[in-house]
Amino acid sequence: MNPVYVVTDIEVNGPTPGEHSMLAFASVALDVAGGEIDTFEAVLETLPEAGEDPITIKWFKGFPEAWAAATTNPDPPHAVMKRYVEWVRGLPGQAVFAAHPLAFDGAWIDHYLRRFCGIRMLKGPWEGERLFHTAGLCLQAIAAGRTGWDFAACFTGAYPPEWLGHVPHSHLSIDDARGYANLLRTLLHMKAPGTRA
């Protein structure tokens, strides 16, 4: 297997795929050594039948630059997801989805892939195509395993800035994806507690 890690961050206007909309997302593709291969980023039109969560919107508007980036010049979701599928399939290896945490970002990407492209994100015993190889990587879980920290203690503000490549966690999807890509690079080269040199 020649994996390419597709580290992804999303921005949304509420917690529930379908009831709310994904506003923007970005992916950074890394090779097994942690070298950056390529990036993808997009801003999406909101789903016509979906609403927005007032608490999420209030929080998001506390980051005006990120809010503007996630809502300016959006493209139709079907066009974005088609481009994304083509981009992932064009990567030089087996694409492995990665996110922090996997359960949140992965659920949104899966929902949009199924709705607009008719394919699933992850491999499993389901009918139809899958875009990514294996079950995906949860960077939060990997961080807990590598560091020995409690899972709940593994969050962006707890990591040393150099682990994130000194990329600010700005809530711009490309910034956050790049920071998490740096985190994965760090974790790939880190030994877990108690392992032999």
Regions found by a protein language model. Give the residues of each.
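Generic detector of well-ordered alpha-helical packing
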Residues: 10-12, 106, 139, 177
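Glycine-rich, phosphate-binding/catalytic loops in enzymes
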Residues: 22-26, 113-117, 191
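A short, structured active-site edge motif that brings together acidic residues
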Residues: 42-45, 123-143
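Active-site-proximal helix-loop-helix substrate-binding element of RNase H-like nuclease domains
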Residues: 46-49, 57, 136-177
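Amphipathic alpha-helical interface surfaces
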Residues: 77-84, 105-112, 135-139
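Acidic, Mg2+-coordinating catalytic module of metal-dependent nucleases/exonucleases
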Residues: 96-102, 107-108, 154-197
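Substrate-recognition/cap helix-loop segment adjacent to the acidic, metal-dependent catalytic center
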Residues: 103-134
